[in-house]
Amino acid sequence: MSAEAKMTTSTATQAGAEALERLRQWPGEHRVAVGLSGGVDSSLTAALMVEAGWEVEGLTLWLMSGKGACCAEGLVDAAGICQQLGVPHHVVDSRDTFVREIVQGLVDGYRAGITPLPCSKCNRSVKFGPMLAWAEQERNLPRIATGHYARIRLDREDGRWKLLRGLDRRKDQSYFLYDLPQEVLARVVFPLGELTKADTRLEAGRHGLRTADKPESQDLCLADHHGSMRAFLDAYIPPRDGEIVLQDGTVVGQHDGIEHFTIGQRKGLGIAWSEPLHVVKLDAAMNQVVVATRAEAGRTGCEVGAMNWVSIAPPPLDSPMEVEVQVRYRSEPVRAHLICIEATANDRAKERPHRCKLTFQEPQFSITPGQGAVLYDGEVVLGGGLIDSPV
């Protein structure tokens, strides 16, 4: 049965109508594999592309056994959406890849005292690249589409594809997409990039999609899968008690594992002090959580490794730039001075020959090794990398 036959109302919202027109005008072949998680965003992505006249096939990556998105529940909902839209549905078992690339990386990172950013790595290593390869090799489909809230534009002056923030700043997911290469941007479509979440719900209802009212996941998929992030970490990392210390080494408390803490954390320290203390460092070698007052916790800059320049060519070494940088998903971008520096041996071993040094216009709180430092010029994502060496 067609998507039109399943609609509960016949008229698209203004945002939906504009999304349909963009899809109809999209350059190149209109044949696509839509990544379906079983949630409302990817469901509407498929429905809009069918309505816009694209040849659509659904593709679900099976990432974990158990309940939730990426698991059995997500597979069932994704299959149901494809049946409702009258399009084929395919499942690719990616569980081994997910464990190797994401689960093990998370465990290793937390053991080393960093707070990893698994979503950006998952997007590059588990989702987008493998999905494109599958679409081309198995189904001869030239494009993929996902339900991410981000936008893509072709700059006809330099011939590069630009990654832009999603129109809905509360749902914008460009922070997690900075690591995509140009060859992926050239072949991916984000139909929801100029919709708000409210628009998505309305359009999903218009199409009568079974996922229209499905609740959103509120946490990292692994945390949802295990019940909490602590439960996930406890399943992989044996507890190891240690000291909580001030920056001068004074012992002020005890902890049950550095993996349960992150930079900037104040609650849950179990310390009575004259003023609130925040985590400023996780010392894996000493198995210590280092704390300080907020006034002492500001950082003037950091180095950023494993850089990917997504929308522009890599700048030359020692060339300065003024940028906006976002250092956590929910944080606001801040002004910073950037200079490209020599890559480390570790960067080069990971085939990432680019590194930069950031100096913030004003000292920043919660600069967290392992998190992304994503660089923006207004709405355009210039690139990004992983924070290390805060100063």
From Swiss-Prot:
Belongs to the MnmA/TRMU family. The keyword Zinc-finger does not apply. SUPFAM superfamilies: Adenine nucleotide alpha hydrolases-like (SSF52402). The active site is at C122 (nucleophile), C221 (cysteine persulfide intermediate). Pfam families: tRNA_Me_trans, tRNA_Me_trans_C, tRNA_Me_trans_M. Its main location: cytoplasm. The gene is mnmA. Residues 171-173, 328-329 are annotated as: Interaction with tRNA. The record marks H148, Q371 as: Interaction with tRNA. This is tRNA-specific 2-thiouridylase MnmA.
